[in-house]
Amino acid sequence: MFVDSVEIIIASGKGGPGMVSFRREKFVIKGGPDGGDGGDGGDVYFEVDNNTDTLASFRGTKHHKAKNGAPGGTRNCTGKKGEDKIIVVPPGTQVFVDDTLWLDLVEPKKRVLALKGGKGGLGNAHFKGATKQQPTYAQKGLEGVEKCVRLELKLIADIGLVGFPNAGKSTLISTISNAKPKIANYEFTTLVPNLGVVSVDEKSGFLMADIPGIIEGASQGKGLGISFLKHIERTKVLAFVLDASRLDLGIKEQYQRLRLELEKFSPALANKPFGVLLNKCDVVENIDKMTRDFCAFLNLEAQKLEAFDLEPYSGFLHPHLTSDFENDPNEKSALFVLPLSAVSALNAHALKFVLLKALQ
């Protein structure tokens, strides 16, 4: 089950109480105080685990509390510190307190202190003085801290696929990555985001995210709404997947409507570097002309992607990208326009290299 939002209560441990005790030895009638300090309460940490991509494990457990510190002992022995509580979350988890962002947990294996445990109380040995040789008082431990927090997951991926329902995004991610999403010939087959690792060669690869299809009004909550648009906010490059075979809605209209929804949801998201994939090109007549016309529509004076083995349809590359694909970060035009067929894997091999270079 994919879960990307939960509310939990976290609490650090209470400090242990100090000890009231006196030294007892043979031939010593009145030994001095030797009560030890209480142990500190356990701390609460968030730890990022790269092996998980959902918050589903929190659905059945709302309270997450560290252990209390142990009481102080005799002979000035300090009580044991309470056991820490380690809360494991996937990369991209954000922690909110009262709708204010508190922690942003991105880096894998990183452990972040959230709540400090209460300090242990002082034993009676600390309170001996010139006028009070036999103190019978010890401090209580300090209380721990409790917070109600909301965990929100924003998946971390390099490439984010954006498209209408049934555009072929799930088929594409299953073709070029290790992801195995549900695929069927009807809209909204994808109900949750999918992550896939794309291996380009033995040393290179990247992470791709496929979110449920966007419909008009998604930014206002229609369809699956904004609940999944947030998962492409962290991506470095967006890939618009357009259905080149649709007769009721051309690729220009598809692109314009998708971009409008992104702009309404987040201008920063809409301004990310992007490319365009014309899917289902194997069932479209004169796809090369359609591709060139679309480049003109984007005001893209494109150069052919001659550096790649295209099979057999030509793709186009932004002219500001050098032979090494070094791009201008202020450039807002498409980085590439590439016809492909996710079903038959036409141009799928070239797509891996194009996306990898676009990330560099």
Curated annotation (Swiss-Prot):
Superkingdom of source: Bacteria
One of the record's GO cellular component terms: cytoplasm
Positions that bind GTP: 163-170, 188-192, 210-213, 279-282, 341-343
Record-linked SUPFAM superfamilies: Obg GTP-binding protein N-terminal domain, P-loop containing nucleoside triphosphate hydrolases
Residue ranges of domain Obg in the record: 1-156
UniProt GO BP: ribosome biogenesis
UniProt xrefs under InterPro entries: G_OBG, GTP-bd, GTP-bd_Obg/CgtA, GTP1-OBG_CS, GTP1_OBG_dom, GTP1_OBG_dom_sf, OBG_GTPase, P-loop_NTPase
Keywords in alphabetical order: Cytoplasm, GTP-binding, Hydrolase, Magnesium, Metal-binding, Nucleotide-binding
GO molecular function: GTP binding; GTPase activity; magnesium ion binding
Cell compartment(s), UniProt: Cytoplasm
Cofactor: Mg(2+)
OBG-type G domain mapped to chain residues: 157-360
Cross-referenced NCBIfam families: Obg_CgtA, PRK12297.1, PRK12299.1
Subunit annotation: Monomer.
Annotated protein name in UniProt: GTPase Obg
Species name: Helicobacter pylori (strain P12)
